[in-house]
Amino acid sequence: PLGALPVDQLINYNSTTWFFRLKGTDLYYFPGVYPKVASEIPFIYQGRKAYMQDAEAPFEIPVSKASDNRSVVSVKASLDGTKMNISRRVVYSGEQKMFGQSVCSPEVSLYGPDHLEAYWRYLKYDDSDPYCVFPKKDASNIKAAFAEYKQKEQADQFKEEVTGYHESDPVKVSGYGVDCVGIRKDSADLVYHVDYEMEGLVKRAGSSMMLAVGKLIGEQMKLEGNDRIRKDRIWRKMAFADEWNIEVALPKGYQASAESLKKLNTTVSNDCGEFAVKASAGAGKIIVHVSKSFLHREEPVANWDKVLKLVDACSAFNEKQVVITKK
């Protein structure tokens, strides 16, 4: 497990984790930590030293790349006075799928109704009811519990997801759903959507409006004071790449200030990753594409200033606004 001694320094087999490798391939199968494609390696095992029973020499378990662990967020928004109606679709791949589990299953369970139905389809059982694999009484109880979860707890989970994304409660959540749980190779991404209304992202300034477009990528890490000083190597769960595709429909008779749009455009790139923003307007819409990547799971402390530049660029964009004026 994460934080344990290297396997060649252990004195107790209870501290080991057993896994399988499909012979002649680079496919590894570890104990599951949440529902996923079976051959996806949990981050807690990546990069660790391991032994196979048919070999004497140890080897290093493969480490995923940033391109393996992606999130793609599509935001479509419209303005209603100072309120904003938002439809957000989230696609997670690789180990980033762990971040979507909070809206997929009850708090007391590793899997939810969407997982059960997806596994049922994957295993191609003939019977159409996925609950028939359980004893009749258990099936009835599980079915009732999952129905209650979808009606009550999942609604709260999606509301909490919105609150976590914006660090502010939504006015209301009008729709949500899990579109794909990501358990099979031909549909490996975890996908969900949520529709809601927010206040505080649009403010009036006379006849104009100020749109907090930077907040549409969710709250970003900001490092201040002593947090900007580091003496140890940098370690994160995984290398990753995030992407946001934002589209904001403007009210009739309004346009985005070309100058404020231009100020959104930025690119910060170095050996550790990249943060880039490209903004434009047309056909009554503001279109913003944002990308962020951290390319390595570990960085030497010598690269801390480079990492800081990326973190600062992300947090600076969080504060960006677009001026919307009457035509």
Question: Residue locations for each model-derived region?
Answer:
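A sensor for short, sequence-defined functional sites
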Residues: 1-327
